Structures are given as C-alpha cells and as structure tokens.
Amino acid sequence: NCGLPYYIGGVIEKESSLLLATPELFRTRYGIDVLLRHEVYSIDPQQRTVGVTNLVTGEKMQMPYDELVLSPGAAPLRPPMPGVDLPGVMTLRTVPDANAIRRYIAEHKVRRALVIGAGFIGLEVAENLQLAGIEVSLVEGGSHVLPPLDAHMSTYVDELLAAHGIGVEVGKIAKGIRRCENGRLQAYNDTWNSVEADLILLSIGVRPEITLAQNAGLRIGETGAIWVDEHMRTSAPGVWAVGDAVQTTNRITGQSTRLAMAGVAQKQARVAADDIAGRPAEFRGVVGTAVLRLFGTTISMTGLNIDTLTRSGDSDYEYVDGHHAQHVGYYPGASPIHARLVYRRSNGKLLGYTAIGKSGAARRTDVVAALLACNATVYDLAEAELCYSPQEGSPKDAVNQLALAAVNNLEGLHPIAHKDDINADSFLLDVREPAEVLQAPYPGAVNIPLSQLRERTQELPHEQKILVFC
C-alpha cells in the first residue's frame, strides 16, 4: 500500500504493478495455500483453532493450527463526526480504496480536493492529486505540517507546498463535514470553515486492528497495539503477531511505541518465522526512521527530535543545524541539505537527525539511523568513514561536519548559540560577504566579512557576548 498515492496520481499506471504476488505464486513456489475472500472471525488459543467465514458461500468453519501468526495491520482513522459517511469523503489504505478514489475523481470531474491530515500519506496524496491537475488544500490539526518533524524543520515543507500552490491550514480540527448548496463538501468546527471541495480525503492516522486479538484474550499493550516479546510472541502460547498491529520498543528511549512502517513489518516477519522454525532470533526495536519524497525534495528523519524531547520533559539535549551540500561545491549540481542533529548534552550520545534536500538527504539519514541502533555518539559520527568522490560527497561529508560542530560544542572549542539565546546584550556579528547580506539581511547585525575580520577586530566590543553567524 506504500504505492497507493502514486497510483491515484497516475505515476503508477496499472493496478497490477501494486500486486507483488499471486495465490498461484505462493502455491507453486512455496507450497502455501492462500484463501482469498475468507475472513477470520475468532481465535481460540486453548483449542488452537480459528473460526473462518467463506465470504462467497457464507460457510463457516473451524480451522486448526499448530502455530498462528497474526498480521491484521492497521485501519485508517475515521472519526465519528457528522458527515463522515457522505459520498466523496474517503480514506486510503487498500487497493480498492485507491480504485474508489480514482473512479470518484473521474465520474464527478473533481477539480478541488481537501486533504485532512498533513502526515506522510496526506502529503503524498496532496502531491499526486495536484500533479493530476486537481487544486489541493491541506488541513492539519497540529501546529505544523508533517508532525514527526520538529516545528523548525517543518518550515522547509511549508515553503515547498507554497511553491507548488498547495494551501495549508494548521491548528484546525474538523468537527464535522457538510454538503454545501452548490454540492461541494466542507469541513468545519465551531469557529472555522474549510475551503469547499469536490472530494475530501481523511488522512489523520491509523489504528491497529486488535479486535481478533482482544476477543481471544491476548494481551494489549499500553499503546493500544498487540503486546509481543522480542521473539514476536504474543501472550498466548503458539501465537505470534507482526506488523502495524503490534507494539514495539523504541531503542533510544526504551519506551513502548507503535511504528506503522513497511520495513519494520518485514523485519518482524522474519523474526517470527525464524522463531517458529526454531532458529534464534530477536527483534530489538526501532529508532524511528522515515522518508518522504515531495515535489522532488527528500524529507528524511530518524530518532528523536527536539519537540518530542521537550514534550517528554527531557532537557538533556543539544542540537546543531547545517546546510552543507551533498557533494563538493566545485562539482556541478551541488545543492544544500538542510539538516539538524540532536544529541545528549551530557555525553554526546546521538538522539536524532533530520535532513531535507534535493539530493543526498536520505543517504545521510541512513548513516545516522545505523549508528543510533548501535548507541553511538557524535564522536563516532564525526569519525565515520563514508563514501567520497566529487560527484558523491566531500572528504568531510555533510553529516561528518554536523557531528564535528557538535564535538566542538561539547569540548568547548566552539560553543553553539541558538536564536533563542539572542537578547538585548548580544552583539550579532554577520561574517558573510556584502553580496550575501543583501540577499538575506539580518536585522540588528553588524557585518564584518570574514575576509576582513582579522584586520577589523578593533571594531568588536569587549564587554558583550559576540554571536557569530554566516
């Protein structure tokens, strides 16, 4: 289902491209029988049977098992509010959902769409609807788009959406949807009305499908997902569970979490299969790595961000921002990666990383993700030996340079100041060249170009803290 937004937009043209395997392939290659149009309605862990309904004939049967694996996934949230079941109010989770949206767009000649929810799926759908020639608006209940980002990094996404003509409203939580006199749909609450649209797509998250497990008496974790141990075993002997429906552990915080990601589900499935087959295997948790490609720009992240840390009451962190190119500047095509590295102020332990750029962002995020899983520090990242050629990187890679800045801060060699540190007593020293200052002047700063700084140090105050930026 990761490809569904691109199927709606026509980037993926054929439904068959989304189907990775057929029942015949499973039977001939693996000797596995696949029962389509059959629904499991109950599990009896004591008797080791599942109740199954044949949806074609209506026949019910009890099927025995030796070992059982649950992989029910997650369902899109559809809040119980007025108008949520009106024609044209839709969700996207399955191929039939995507086909229904495509049909509705064609049959109703949709010209304007409203996407409620500006997370990963919401943004991907918004992009693909816009590329298909539909005017798109986004509504997000949180304080900024793409909530897994911190507020500062999300501003790059704001600029990207604005540049491509997608309207965004944040801090708006719909309490209902109504049909207007002109036939269009409109979301609303007590103090706000959305734009009118021909189609509303709800993309406000998913909930784990736990009904079967709950009815069977399986333990449900504090996150509302199925509890499993490190071998993917549930609380019932002979029953394993994997994927979007299960609870896992954040490897950085040690706390329980849910992470509905395809890569996580794949790894959990292998662990469960190994455990059933008697091979030693453990799923050690997640660090939270994700990526989105939006209008040619990559938005990637791993670990914790400063908003998450602040909400949890954790103040033992520091961060450094950077805008290094994906490869050396003298080779054509260099473009910046806007990045933020978060680490422990007390010991330099890596906590998280976000990278946004036209090229190379995901590669750097993967490097940090791998180190996060190893409990590494900024010292490890600073010394990481990464690929280099003029076309592919720099001798000191973009991610090395961020780590080196963090090391310099930890060691007191070059302390970092943030925007919040600026006050009336600060002396702001802008060391950019005059042409650069004209492009983006900073109010209240004194410009002494770096090329002239050594000869003009007498112009600097001795009684004020000097904050330098470039």
Question: What residue spans do the PLM features occupy?
Answer:
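Beta1-alpha1 glycine-rich phosphate/pyrophosphate-binding loop at the start
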Residues: 1-39, 126-149, 289, 363, ...
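AMP-binding/adenylate-forming core of the ANL superfamily
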Residues: 50, 55, 68, 198-201, ...
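Mid-to-C-terminal Rossmann-like scaffold of FAD/NAD(P)H-dependent oxidoreductases
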Residues: 245-359, 391-394, 398-424
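A Rossmann-like FAD-binding core segment of flavoenzymes
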Residues: 35-52, 56, 63, 131-228
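Catalytic cysteine-centered active loop of the rhodanese-like fold, especially the PTP/DSP P-loop
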Residues: 448-450, 454-470
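Rossmann-like dinucleotide-binding cores of NAD(P)H-dependent redox enzymes
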Residues: 18-19, 112-113, 120-178, 261-264, ...
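FAD-site-proximal beta/loop scaffold in flavoenzymes
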Residues: 85-109, 183, 194-274, 367, ...
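Glycine-rich dinucleotide-binding loop and its adjacent helix/turn
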Residues: 70-132, 167, 222, 228-230, ...
